Amino acid sequence: MDEEENSEINSVQARDEDVQLEDQQSQGLQDRQVDVIEQAWNNAMPDEPSPPAEDAFQDPLATDGEGGDALEAMVENVLQDDTASEGSHPSSDMSLESPGSEDDSDLESLPHWMIPQNRLRSAVDMMVSQARNRDGGIAALLSGDNFLQRVRSMVFSQERRRSRTSEETSQEAAEQPVDPPPQQPPRPPIDIGFDTNLPAEHSYFGNHLSRVPGVDYLEVGSVHHMLIFLHQHILFPGEVLPFMIDGRMFDEDMPGLDGLIFGVSFPRLQPPEDNPHKLYGVTCQIYERGESGRGLVFYKSRALQRIVINCDDIKGSPQYIARNPTSKCFSKVKILPEYFLPEPLQTVDMGSMARFRDIPSMRDKYRRFQLSTTTWPSDACQEYSFSSIVERARQRLESQKIDTMPKCPIQLSFWLVRNLHLTEKMMRLTFLTDSVNTRLQLIKSTFKDETLFFCRYCNSSLALCSDLFAMSKHGVQTQYCNPEGYIHETNTVYRVISHAIGYSGEPSTKFSWFPGYQWHIILCKFCAQHVGWEFKAVHPNLTPKVFFGLAGSSVRIGKASEYSPFNGTTYVVRNMMRMISSDME
């Protein structure tokens, strides 16, 4: 009997020791989580972030602040993690009404005392959404006592709610549509009392530029040896590229000085893993030049044709044209073709009835006669109709006050890409295709998409693409050059989402891209990164009185389904959760 009692006592003591050990491990983990959270919060979201100096934001490429780089690197890591896990870990819902919205695939591999990462993320999202309407916001949430205990309580509350919800309710919640972005007040008609030719002339370079004659289109498929540069933005044929560079880069003895042609390639257009031995770009031809008085020369050039470069043919080290290149780089480039097939019905020979084709009152009847002679259904012909795509694009751009739409199908396809603001993936597809018809079909597929501008650094929403309008005759997106030679791709919008931006420095009228307007640097409210400029009229007769220019290097285009009013805040808190997870590993 004594042996049985001793055995039972020993087993109880062993269980107590195991429980005590688990409690110690859990407490140690919680202590580490608290330390990491406090450190991450202090680094990522200071209570009163001091705005960077004005000089630092003359161009985002010129800033090398340690804090900005650290936050940018941290944000890029999270973006990569989110992209990589998109298929297996869908974004958690912030509502308790959506049980089972997280992936449970990682539950079995974790100790029972550790909260799974997806459950932790869901609980933190809920706490963030509740804290945003309270005094103090997120800072008060993290500075309060027993933060981890409240996270655990929220996790357990969600678990209990999930267990009480039936499978039918879960399926119904999963099928609920994504909340659309908040409805902004209807935009009043924009009355532009401004000469839109001025930005297109880049008059901030001065009035002493001289014209350079010649516009040369090179033969399709031909190979040429020319000077090449790199560029951080994607240029499409027809765009104007202003830049400032050392005049010695273009020697007088170089062939073809009249309308000098050079190549500009885009490293971000072609991912290295796709085809590491090729670079895609455009040929550019200089049409105006002028001295700056500082040993640099102002140039205006226009993109003409798409090219492909074999990296093995590059002689030298290519440099970015926006960063004052100091050495020349030459390479062989091949001119890419542009194939365009006429509309299907235009290939149908109607004989003597063809004379009715251009009579407006007979056009519909003539079309019906054409359709009756083919095996194609009317919908198929309408789907690939060039005039149909042009009309739909015209209706979509009607609110942007653009009246310079080209009539040539090739030029129109490139022009639409610049003014419809496609996602980066779609821009890459439209640039790489040689078929104008395919390019127009890709553009047409985006007509129904509602898109927004998101901060490239923290993913918070900044403006609606429907608020774009043209302050230049070239359209809503234009390349501009600042006094330091950096080139900015600028998108002009009528307004931004409320409480999305802050300001840095003082407003100025020097080197203004829009004569008669002063510019003021704007920052993302969540991450304090440079995202563009506010332009305000200094003359009473100019309209609009205020508009915004979003820097293409600091924003990205995304679908409206990605919008969330918590995007920026939740992103920072999720970033801290990632750091906790990596620290535990």
Curated annotation (Swiss-Prot):
Post-translational modification, as annotated: Ubiquitinated.
A cellular-component GO term for this protein: Cul4A-RING E3 ubiquitin ligase complex
Disruption phenotype annotation: Viable and fertile however, adults and larvae display an increase in body size and tissue growth as a result of increased cell number. Overgrowth is due to an up-regulation in insulin-like signaling both systematically and in the fat body, which in turn results in the down-regulation of insulin-like peptide (ILP) inhibitors, conv and ImpL2, and thus allows increased activity of the ILPs. RNAi-mediated knockdown in the fat body results in an increase in pupal length, adult body weight and posterior wing area.
InterPro entries linked to this entry: CULT, Lon_prtase_N, Yippee/Mis18/Cereblon
UniProt xrefs under Gene3D superfamilies: 1.20.58.1480, Peptide methionine sulfoxide reductase (2.170.150.20)
Composition skew (Polar residues), residue ranges: 80-95
BP GO terms, sorted: positive regulation of neuromuscular synaptic transmission; positive regulation of Wnt signaling pathway; protein ubiquitination
Residues covered by region (Disordered): 1-109, 156-195
A GO molecular-function descriptor: metal ion binding
Keyword Transit peptide: no
Ranges of biased composition (kind: Basic and acidic residues): 158-167
Lon N-terminal domain segment(s): 225-451
Expression sites by tissue: Expressed in the fat body (at protein level).
Composition-biased stretches (Pro residues): 178-189
Alphabetical keyword list: Metal-binding, Nucleus, Ubl conjugation, Ubl conjugation pathway, Zinc
Subunit structure: Likely a component of a DCX (DDB1-CUL4-X-box) protein ligase complex. May interact with pic/DDB1.
Extra remark: The name 'Ohgata' means 'large' in Japanese and refers to the overgrowth phenotype in mutants.
Family in the record: Belongs to the CRBN family.
Protein name: Protein cereblon
Organism: Drosophila melanogaster
Gene for this chain: ohgt
